Amino acid sequence: METIKRHLDLRPILKAKSCFLLGPRQTGKTSLLEAQLPDATRIDLLDDEIFLRLQAKPTMLRDYIKHSGQVVVIDEIQRVPPLLNEVHRLIESDKSIRFVLTGSSARKLRKKGVNLLGGRARSRRLHPFVWAELQGSKIGFDLPRSLLYGSIPSIVYSDAPRDDLKSYVGDYLKEEIAMEAATRNLPAFSRFLETAAHCNGQILNFQKIGNDAQVKRSTAQNYFELLRDTLLGSDLPAYKKTRSRKATTTSKFYFFDLGVVQYLRGVRDLAKGTPLFGEAFEAYIHHELASWCDYHSDHELSYWRSQDGRHEVDFIINGDVAIECKSTHAVDAGDIKGLNAFALETTLRHRIIVCFEPRPRRVSGIEILPWAHFLEKLWSGDLIR
């Protein structure tokens, strides 16, 4: 099986500091580290013997340190948060040692009193595959498949993606949530997940979601926080720095992978031209943009909507690049209204419509780009530097 080269490269980071590498299960953290750091010492906290030993006596971590300049990978660091105190001590005693601390959940790491190394480690998040990684591989990039089955590496490689998505969601419910001891009511959480999937890319109405999932409003809020903590979803903040029109201030919520969303929704087919296809296309572009922003420092992703709801722009990068997604082969005047309205509120370097037109063109200062052309410009660095 081909090992697909990942865009995220930890080696430049490790020249300066240690690193947290966070990401949901099966996003490829282990494969990335094996490819980039083949000589690193690996400590797997999913190994019960190692887990019990280091949980009982975190100072035994020093037994794994053999020489200066060593790189030590600790997998699933959230299982033994007190181990971070020993990591801190070892970094202080030998400035040449580097740790890579992986985690599939940030929940226990965010608790009060957990040592996050006080700036001695940078943090990176690994996403499922992106266009630039698949396009350059033997597998290649298949947009319809990505919209339906997502980009989790094990699903991309799979000959039975829907069956494997079923297993993935089941494993998440049984293992990740149970391991975190985050909720004891798995049937209610399962109902909530299905309801939440229908809210992907939307502003959340906790009362309605709670009613649909047959849980309290406060429980729905807590469950969304659990999704964030276990890296299964994240917020897209609203852009608020407008000149005249008041803007919506509430975030939208996105799951980390579109295949998980489609499985939870029960979607088995996506027909072009349908609202469902349009939603999926927009969510996929969000995946690409969120991944790009996380892999490159100092970039902010948001969306803009006027408070009266009349105008909206799907994505804003750094406040000066506005991007609209349209699953159409022919962009018309109605498709550019949101970009034009937003241009009156701030100074923009780029206004872009990502669509299915056959070739790039420009209309009234707006770049109309075929989706593949847009992604090539994004990942090559031609769009944002």
Model-identified regions with their sequence ranges:
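Pre-Walker A adenine-sensing motif
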Residues: 1-13
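Hydrophobic anchor at the beta1->P-loop junction of P-loop NTPases
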Residues: 21
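Conserved lysine of the Walker
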Residues: 29-30
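Short glycine-rich substrate-engagement loop in P-loop NTPases that contacts/grips substrate
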Residues: 43-71
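Domain-level recognition of nuclease-like catalytic cores that cleave nucleotide substrates
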Residues: 138, 358-385
